[in-house]
């Protein structure tokens, strides 16, 4: 590959290895867990790299074919990453609430996208200014709502070749729609997620923005390599700044022993 592959040390610096509390785990994630510390699971970064490399090959091939991917991340930790990734690489994104039927009822979604295009065109050609003030307010309000829910996919004229989803558990509806249509799904799976619901799971922390950023950036770089694109550099942080943890956050003290999880046979 021509692009620079992310390393294990870089993943570690981004906090990719930090899983959820052991009591909140999904046993199907056992093959991807290194152990536990301070009552939190720790993800095996070697397994993360293996899965990431497979995902990179997939998105690289999609880029080489001139096709597009849809980034999905509606959680706070993912909103900026998926938007920046799509804008940098000419792909699509959803970072607000997933609209049911976005994929499975795409014809209806296209009609709503066209409504957004028409409003934008009326602004450009001056037709909107000819309407009454009341009508303009209502139309612009509709535009704002459409832009919020469809802005990231308003250039999507056909179904994407793949979905890249941050936290498939939170955006399970999007995952189910894609799987129903045989669209492959790459999912960043924390230790509380069922990895079987996606086509290609990548074990990774989905709460830290730095973790999400570095994983999404790695996939964008692979896509750009396949599509022969020169990307503008990402402005998002990929290194966790050490600070005092607030109550309820994952805490990994250095004086605790490591415990291996019970592995399943699955």
Swiss-Prot record:
The gene is rpsB. Keywords: Ribonucleoprotein, Ribosomal protein. This is Small ribosomal subunit protein uS2. The keyword Transmembrane does not apply. Gene3D superfamilies: Glucose-6-phosphate isomerase like protein, domain 1 (3.40.50.10490), Helix hairpin bin (1.10.287.610). It comes from Mesoplasma florum (strain ATCC 33453 / NBRC 100688 / NCTC 11704 / L1) (Acholeplasma florum). GO terms for biological process: translation. CDD domains: RPS2 (cd01425). PROSITE patterns: RIBOSOMAL_S2_2 (PS00963).
């Amino acid at each position: 590959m021509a692009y620079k592959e992310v390393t294990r040390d870089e993943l570690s610096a981004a906090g990719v290895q930090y899983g959820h509390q052991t009591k909140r785990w999904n046993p199907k994630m056992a093959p991807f867990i290194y152990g536990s510390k301070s009552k939190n699971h720790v993800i095996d970064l070697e397994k993360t790299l293996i899965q990431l490399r497979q995902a990179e090959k997939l998105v690289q091939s999609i880029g080489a074919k001139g096709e597009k991917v849809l980034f999905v991340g509606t959680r706070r930790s993912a909103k900026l990453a998926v938007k920046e990734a799509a804008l940098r690489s000419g792909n699509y994104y959803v970072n607000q609430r997933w609209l049911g039927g976005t994929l499975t009822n795409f014809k209806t979604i296209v009609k709503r996208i066209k409504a957004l295009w028409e409003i934008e065109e009326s602004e450009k050609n001056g037709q909107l200014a000819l309407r009454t003030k009341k009508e303009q307010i209502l139309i612009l309000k509709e535009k704002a709502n459409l832009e919020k829910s469809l802005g990231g996919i308003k250039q999507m004229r056909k179904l994407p070749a793949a979905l890249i989803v941050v936290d498939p558990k939170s955006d399970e509806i999007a995952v189910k729609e894609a799987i129903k249509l045989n669209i492959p799904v790459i999912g960043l799976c924390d230790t509380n997620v069922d990895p079987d619901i996606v086509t290609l799971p990548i074990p990774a922390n989905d709460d830290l923005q730095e973790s999400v950023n570095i994983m999404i950036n790695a996939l964008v770089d692979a896509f750009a390599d396949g599509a022969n694109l020169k990307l503008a550099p990402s402005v998002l942080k990929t290194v966790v700044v050490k600070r005092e943890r607030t109550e309820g956050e994952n805490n990994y003290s250095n004086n605790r022993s490591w415990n291996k999880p019970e592995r399943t046979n699955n």
